[in-house]
Amino acid sequence: MIENMFSIPIVKYRCTNWKQKKQDFLALLNEQTLTMGEESVYSDYGEYDTLTAEHQMGLYDTPNYLNRIRELLKEEMEWFAHDLNADPQIVRAWFERALYKNHHPPHTHGHGGWSAVLYIEYDPTVHTSTVFVSPFNHFVTGMQLNYMPEVEEGDLVLFPSFILHYTQLNESDVQRTVASFNMTVDMDNIPLGWLTKSNKGDSKQTVIKPLSGL
């Protein structure tokens, strides 16, 4: 008898009322300042309004930015709570936009919790979804195992934060825009790395620079 010792979940939801939510997310994004960082994409990741922890933790006040995202994804978080028998709380959120030749190198979001990506502007004819890298290789060939979910605009993909992942080069002139966030399954289990001021409310990412010419 053959049994599988390990499995890694990934959750995908189609956002309700997406036409309106897309406009709401884009309006929120347009209020932010996106800059190019070491991730080789435009993001507001380091801006103050994206930084948060529950105010009772005594580290940051919860900004309207985060509250708005919580409101927009309230129903989807209720689905996650039901499916995983959890009490999910979004504790950090940011936007990311990839223009021509932009990409996000391989990285993780720390040792615990869940993370998510919401595809806001995404054309499957010219864009590719997030690439997830297995923490173990193929048991026969030893080759690296990758997984790319099939997605479209309005899809919300949630995954364990420790999973290495990246985005491929945007080879088109069509911008690719996502919202990302970190969340905990309940407020008693927030990864400590997300609550340190030096890490701006998030775990310190491990960024692997791409090879020259890629």
What are these regions (language model features)?
Residues 165:
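Glycine-rich nucleotide phosphate-binding loop and flanking beta-alpha elements
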Residues 131, 182-214:
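Double-stranded beta-helix
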Residues 89-158, 168, 175, 185-195:
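Catalytic core of non-heme Fe(II) oxygenases with the double-stranded beta-helix
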Residues 1-84, 103, 199-202, 213:
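Non-heme Fe(II)/2-oxoglutarate
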